[in-house]
Amino acid sequence: KSTLMKIIAGVEKSYRGEVVWAPGYSVGYLEQEPQMDPDKTVIEVVQEGVQEVMDVLNEYNEISLKFMEPMDDDQMNALIERQGELSEKIEHLGGWEIDAKLERAMDALNCPPPDAKISTLSGGERRRVALCRLLLREPDVLLLDEPTNHLDTESIQWLEAHLRQYKGTVIAVTH
């Protein structure tokens, strides 16, 4: 079962045949042993799931700081225009509520504290962080290999409810 998931995800290459996805489809895969940068914190890994939003917010904040610097009218107008574009994009992506969304997802999956280093986490804690990151990414196709391993009853119930309303395709391998 796990090998089939790896083939579908494009991780396993030693097989005959091919997996073809329609252009533009995104696929997210929760491995049994998720790979994460051990030097990062929990919140840094979880934020990877919403990287586009984080990048836009960071640029918006950088522009806000530039308003304190001296500049001419043309520079000021360019900054105002760019900040307006970014504000619209943030609104479209739901970026103004991203901190609350991250906190809800992390709480629901009983993730470790946001400032905990990945290198200090148990295997179960790492899986919960990886699952949180993946669900926030919202790929078109979710491939979940034993998604309930290491989850408590409350987290399993939350995950089941979340997957029932998920807008994409969900393929899960469970016992």
Residue ranges and their predicted role:
Residues K1-H175:
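ABC ATP-binding cassette signature C-motif
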